[in-house]
Amino acid sequence: MAEIRKGDTVKVIAGKEKGKSGRVLEVLREDGRVRVEKLMTVKRHQKKGRSQANPEGGILEMAGTIAISSVMVVGKDEKPVRREKIGRELGAKEKARLQKRKAAAK
């Protein structure tokens, strides 16, 4: 299983958001959950003057959390990633996260 990190593109494989994909905003390792952009939005009611970011208060919409076991890392082409390692591509000078996919069935 590929390790999920901030900025990865993931696809939800279980729950009410099943089949949707988005970018990971935050990984909460101790809780075993992730925040995914534009998925599992929750509403929070905030009083006036409680935060400097939103002094007028009101109803705020923010990304909720999803269990890590309910998401799967996908590549740029929306296909699942099976293996991942940190290394250099041929001719590259910098290390990067390299992804491998399952071999096609013949």
Curated annotation (Swiss-Prot):
Q: Which UniProt keywords apply?
A: Ribonucleoprotein, Ribosomal protein, RNA-binding, rRNA-binding
Q: Which GO terms describe its biological process?
A: translation
What are this entry's molecular-function GO terms? Answer: rRNA binding; structural constituent of ribosome
Record's compositionally biased regions (Basic and acidic residues): 84-97
For this protein, the record's NCBIfam families field holds: rplX_bact
The protein's assembly and partners: Part of the 50S ribosomal subunit.
- Please report which protein family the annotation says this sequence is part of: Belongs to the universal ribosomal protein uL24 family.
List the protein's name: Large ribosomal subunit protein uL24
**What is the organism field in this record?**
Anaeromyxobacter sp. (strain K)
* Gene behind the chain: rplX
